[in-house]
C-alpha cells in the first residue's frame, strides 16, 4: 500500500500498535501542543554501509523522530497519519542511510524542537520476545519496563503467550 505522499506503507505490528497507542494517549491527555514529536529507537545494524559482519556481537541503536500536527492526530484518520509518518521516516533510512547528516544531529535535536512540542518516546519491540528469556530460574510471568515510568515513553513488547503486544 502507498500513503498520501506515495510512500510505501510499513504495516508492521510495531508501527500499527505504536500509531494506535499514540493517538489514544494524545486524546486521553488532551494534548494542547500544536505538534507531537515521537522518538523511536532504531536498530541501525541492517542499514550500515558497509554491513557489519555476521560475527558482530553488539548493538548499534540510534533514534528517529517523527513530527505530526496534533490536530491531525485527533482527527478521524489519526492512526493513518502516524503510520504514514513512521513509514516515511523508515523510508528515509533506506534512501539516505542512517548516518546521513550525523554531523548536524545535535543541532537539529536542540534547534528543531519548539518549546511547545509534546515529546513522546517509544522503547522496546514485540520482536525482542521478552517472555522467552530464561536466565536459569524459568521464564518470566510478567515483564514491566520500570525505567520509563517517569518519562513520556511507551514500552512495546510481545505478550506473554506470544499472540499480541503489550503497551
Label every model-predicted segment.
Residues 1-167:
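Acyl-CoA-dependent O-acyltransferases
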Amino acid at each position: 500500500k502507498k500513503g498520501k505522499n506515495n510512500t510505501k506503507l510499513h504495516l508492521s505490528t510495531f508501527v500499527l500498535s505504536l500509531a494506535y497507542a499514540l493517538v489514544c494517549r494524545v486524546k486521553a491527555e488532551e494534548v494542547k501542543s500544536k505538534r507531537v514529536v515521537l522518538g523511536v529507537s532504531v536498530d541501525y545494524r541492517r542499514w550500515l554501509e558497509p554491513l557489519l559482519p555476521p560475527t558482530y556481537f553488539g548493538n548499534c541503536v540510534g533514534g528517529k523522530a517523527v513530527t505530526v500536527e496534533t490536530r491531525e492526530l485527533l482527527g478521524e484518520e489519526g492512526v493513518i497519519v502516524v503510520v504514514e509518518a513512521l513509514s516515511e521516516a523508515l523510508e528515509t533510512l533506506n534512501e539516505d542511510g542512517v548516518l546521513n547528516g550525523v554531523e548536524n544531529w545535535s543541532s537539529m535535536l536542540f534547534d528543531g524542537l519548539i518549546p511547545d512540542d509534546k515529546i513522546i518516546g517509544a522503547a522496546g519491540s514485540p520482536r525482542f520476545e521478552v517472555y522467552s528469556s530464561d536466565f536459569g530460574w524459568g521464564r518470566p510471568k510478567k515483564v514491566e519496563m520500570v525505567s520509563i515510568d517517569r518519562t513520556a515513553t511507551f514500552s512495546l513488547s510481545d505478550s506473554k503467550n506470544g499472540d499480541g503486544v503489550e503497551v
